[in-house]
Amino acid sequence: FWIDLRLPLHDNDTPAQCWAQFRVSLPAWSNETQHELIETLQLAPHLDKRLNMLSTGSRRKVGLVAALASGATVTLLDQPFVSLDQPSIRSLQAFLAQQGQNTDRAWLIADYEEPAHLPLVSVIQL
């Protein structure tokens, strides 16, 4: 799974339209995860707004919902905490910590430093 919502391709789409497009091509998509993350990442007030109307942090949250709900076997999260508010960072950390017990999916986090409060199986320094 790959997405970069900074690209202008999705500027005129709402979050719901983006997720509907991804859901079609992702058979393991989790509606339950999508709805849980909409709540915990506080995206409900933004569901009818076009992406080009959202802040950088809210736009990143839309992409994170897609990545986390995708059901992809391997998901790379490139600097997932950038531009997020503290409650969203804590929610994302809690979600990833919970998913760490799931052996059906692998999560790769690329970042400049190890995320605090998130147990990691392995760390590769480049």
Residues of each region from the PLM?
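Conserved catalytic loops of ABC-family nucleotide-binding domains
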Residues: P87, F95-H117
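ABC-family nucleotide-binding domains
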Residues: D78, L84-I89
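Conserved ABC ATPase "signature" region
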Residues: E32-H46
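Conserved ABC ATPase signature
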Residues: R50-R59
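ABC ATPase nucleotide-binding domain signature region
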Residues: F1-V24, P115-A116
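Hydrophobic anchor residue at the start of the ABC signature
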Residues: L64
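Hydrophobic residue in the Walker B motif beta-strand
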Residues: T73-T75
